[in-house]
Amino acid sequence: MKAFLKRKNIVFSAKRYGIDALGAMAQGLFCSLLIGTIVKTLGQQLSIPFLVEVGGFASAMSGPAMAVAIGYALQAPPLVLFSLATVGYAANALGSTTLSGSAGAGGPLAVLLIAIVAAECGKAVSKETKVDIIVTPSVTICVGILLAMWWAPSIGAAASAVGNAIMWATDLQPFFMGIAVSVLVGMALTLPISSAAICAALGLTGLAGGAAVAGCCAQMVGFAVMSFKENKW
């Protein structure tokens, strides 16, 4: 088994899944949803319909972009990598709803977990048959969508519950909870994990979202001041 996993480049480790995959997911999120939101907002403020359309299309591709980025971080072969676009779309769409059908915030988190499993399953069967071009995409997509249908709504509900609890506590005690949220998100910014991905997965908005932004800004100002001697202007 160890020899098979090594040959398939399947490594079960916290670094690969919690750092490499999560960081790649954040990049995929930025290159789709976040940049799309920025462009769309510019279009709305400047009354440029083209930018609004561009932003809408970019935001709509957040699921596939995150899944493909995760597959790239896991060093998935081409057929697995391309198949993850479908998996990401399904996981993001189903993770954005709860079991009751209401809106959920677990799209990015669902994409992360499901894309990892689908990618590793695809890697396991890749180039094992003479009809690899059929088997590998089929396994990757079927496993991914099956897990998306099974897990994603629950992930969406759980992420929404956690995010809502944080936002409720922040509204109840804005000073102390604002400090806690800003410090924790700021610390996440300094670690090899993605603060943007965490906040997106929990759907933080309102005071909690503002506290997270303040924490990140404070950390970046601190980095700039501490490294000014080495980096200059």
Where do the model's predicted regions map?
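Pore-lining transmembrane helices
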Residues: 1-233
